[in-house]
Amino acid sequence: MARPLCPACGSRSVQKWGRTSSGAQRWRCGDCRGAFTLKIDNSAKRLDEFLGWLLSKKRQADMPGAGRTFRSRTREFWHVWPLPPVTGEVCRVVFVDGIYLARNVCVLIARSEEHVLGWYVSKSENSRAYKALMARIAPPDVVVTDGGSGFQKARRELWPNTRVQRCTFHAFEQVKRYTTTRPRTQAGVDLYALAKKLLKAEDSGQAAAWLAAYARWCSDYDEFLREETTNDEGRTFLTHERLVKARNSLTALVRQNTLFTYVDPALTERLGALPATNNAVESLNGQPRHMLREHRGLSLERRVKAVCWWCHMHTECPLPAAEILRAMSTDESIAREMRAMSYEDRASLGPQRWGDGLVWEELHRSTPWGRDWD
């Protein structure tokens, strides 16, 4: 067995010096005359135990001691922030979506067709948050999105050459929200039928036929949608305002040319079949929601970190537990760096990699009394 280093002076001039009352080998340094024992670092093993529980259906109530020993062994890992990797992988398609954990806490997730590429914690879906997410990912050929606010601005700045496919299912749902499934007017019936056909377009010919049918609908009901009503107070408003909003939502997508990117021959010849919806990523994003349901009762901060842990473990090459503990930031390390910087330095850095600076301040309190988020 190699002689250990003295933790006090770093010398290897040590010798065995009996055993402690628990039976552990005691060592004595010949230089500084200090005695010490070696401690086995099992933090990586405990982190694996923690992640095994978090990503499973195991209940703490079913553990020995009703989970008290488990909580004591793994409490420190709730202070770790899993950070997204910087990847140079150029993907054919990237899906972007957000998970809201509270009214003003959102985790934006970007993933390829196989694994998670990155994530970002923010207060809402805005251009600043999307830019922080997209800046760490190589521009793909096509990005599929549900049309979250701020995405287009961020894409124009960071991924200007990337084609956008607006999720056709979300476009249909937006129309259905205005028309309902049982429209009261013929215009609403026809528009709802058109919206359903939007989900069935499979090639460029069917896409062109849908666009022609939509143009005819707009022309046929143009005068009908211009009708106005004046109420008793003298205020004038559009009679069919909800139909107008449904039309405007589709018209904006047609003008942006983002509805039928997936059947563009120039892209399909080079990239093959492309997705029309982000249903695949929606179903995968349902997994962290299911994980949170399995572990009901977590605080908001722990729910955020749980989703970040899920994202990290579903990247292409998740780090081993020992490397995670060496590489990832903790609450204490982040707070220490923030205290070390002046206000001007913090302002010049912009948003932190793990999320908005505002989220950090609101998730941590300086007094023993907390505030409820939900």
Regions found by a protein language model. Name each.
Residues C6-C9, C29:
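Short cysteine-rich clusters marking metal-coordination/redox-active sites
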Residues L54-P64:
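Short, charged amphipathic recognition helices of the HTH superfamily
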Residues R28, A35, A66-N161, A280:
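RNase H-like nuclease fold core
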Residues M1-P4:
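A broadly conserved sequence feature marking short terminus-proximal activation segments
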Residues R26, R33, T37-E49, V142-G148, ...:
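Acidic/histidine-rich catalytic cores and adjacent linkers
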Residues D97, D146-A195:
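Conserved beta-strand -> loop -> alpha-helix junction used to position metal-binding or nucleic-acid-contacting
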Residues S11-Q15, T37:
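Short functional micro-motifs and their immediate structural scaffolds
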Residues K16-R26:
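Short linker/helix segments within small regulatory modules
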